[in-house]
Amino acid sequence: MNNDVVELAKDLISRPSVTPLDEGCQTLMANRLAAVGFNIEPMVFEDTTNMWARRGNCDPVFCFAGHTDVVPTGDLNRWHTPPFEPTIIDNYLHGRGAADMKGSLAAMIIATERFVAKHPDHNGSIAYLITSDEEGPFINGTTRVIDTLEARNEKMTWALVGEPSSTHKLGDVVKNGRRGSLTGNLTVNGIQGHVAYPHLADNPIHKAVPALTELAQMHWDNGNEFFPPTSFQIANINGGTGASNVIPGELTVMFNFRYSTEVTAEELILRVVSILDAHGLDYDINWIFNGLPFLTGDGPLLDATREAIREVTGYETDPQTSGGTSDGRFIAPTGAQVLELGPVNATIHKVNECVNVADLEILANCYERILEKLLCK
């Protein structure tokens, strides 16, 4: 088996690029891409390193999208091997970012190099949109690059995001959409006082519980053939001073919606506000829009990806919209078709993150085949 993908993945993993750090990962990638004719455009916004790279000047534009940052390691004592010293054990490459998503980045680069060597005069353009701010607050990453591209009317036709989409084996699942994400930060106001004198206080916890119960039990929608029903989850709740004899003066609650295309963020906000008002709460609330839902239906990108996976692996892929959000949510509103295809996600964000070594070569072959189907017609 050719080990080019594994060696590049190891080089990337060895760089401790905990978000928003890049630690030279993009420079490594840029040097490889420049050598095969890409124009490299670094885009640094505050603490975030981004890269837009492009080979070709005409449509259609196929873009590989991904991130060089990784989540923190967690307890180092629980790792079998140092997280930034990539190690192969029983045919699995271990290290932080192996599956999310430095293995994918390596497969993208190798696939691109092989494709360009075989098809130097390919149709359209190949691009890369890479950020070091996907695992963090996602303020100065892909969103800022998209804003820059939109301002000069530079569009992508197709975007393939290297997120670890697979469930049991490489390519068994691709993500052809994602639910929207909306976070609410609620503060319920009361009056602090002594628990022995409740008539002189106003307990915000007691007042909020019925409203929160109604929100938690609410049926928001039925979903559809592509998306499960909208989910409401309380993520954090805090109230009280820690003392047993003090009624708190306020209660704070953070909750999140993962919502389908059957409802809008605006509709969810109106329904939440109506419930809070109906319970007579004195409250303040602010909203964080994390991303709109998107869906890529049948079309050139999904068709090419299905065919490529079938030809390389021998089995069919299953397009799904489950799971968390990705930077695909920022690309989709530009009008590009967006898919996610990457390694098995069983160990992502965990200690002892790893990826099957053979899967990296399979992934590179899938990526190369997709390029051929879209840019060699």
Swiss-Prot record:
A molecular function (GO) term: zinc ion binding
Residue numbers binding Zn(2+) 2: D100, E135, H349
Database matches in CDD domains: M20_DapE_proteobac
The keyword Zinc is annotated on this UniProt entry: yes
Cofactor(s), names only, from the UniProt record: Zn(2+); Co(2+)
BP GO annotations: diaminopimelate biosynthetic process; L-arginine biosynthetic process; lysine biosynthetic process via diaminopimelate
E.C. code: 3.5.1.18
Broadest EC class assigned to this enzyme: hydrolase
Alphabetical UniProt keywords: Amino-acid biosynthesis, Cobalt, Diaminopimelate biosynthesis, Hydrolase, Lysine biosynthesis, Metal-binding, Zinc
Pathway listed: Amino-acid biosynthesis; L-lysine biosynthesis via DAP pathway; LL-2,6-diaminopimelate from (S)-tetrahydrodipicolinate (succinylase route): step 3/3
Catalytic activity: N-succinyl-(2S,6S)-2,6-diaminopimelate + H2O = (2S,6S)-2,6-diaminopimelate + succinate
Record note on cofactor: Binds 2 Zn(2+) or Co(2+) ions per subunit.
InterPro entries, per the entry: Bact_exopeptidase_dim_dom, DapE_proteobac, Peptidase_M20, Peptidase_M20_dimer, Peptidase_M20A
Active site: residue positions: D69, E134 (proton acceptor)
Annotated residues for binding of Zn(2+) 1: H67, D100, E163
Subunit structure and binding partners: Homodimer.
Role summary: Catalyzes the hydrolysis of N-succinyl-L,L-diaminopimelic acid (SDAP), forming succinate and LL-2,6-diaminopimelate (DAP), an intermediate involved in the bacterial biosynthesis of lysine and meso-diaminopimelic acid, an essential component of bacterial cell walls.
HAMAP family: DapE
UniProt-listed NCBIfam families: dapE_proteo (TIGR01246), PRK13009.1 (NF009557)
Family: Belongs to the peptidase M20A family. DapE subfamily.
Protein name: Succinyl-diaminopimelate desuccinylase
Source species of the chain: Shewanella frigidimarina (strain NCIMB 400)
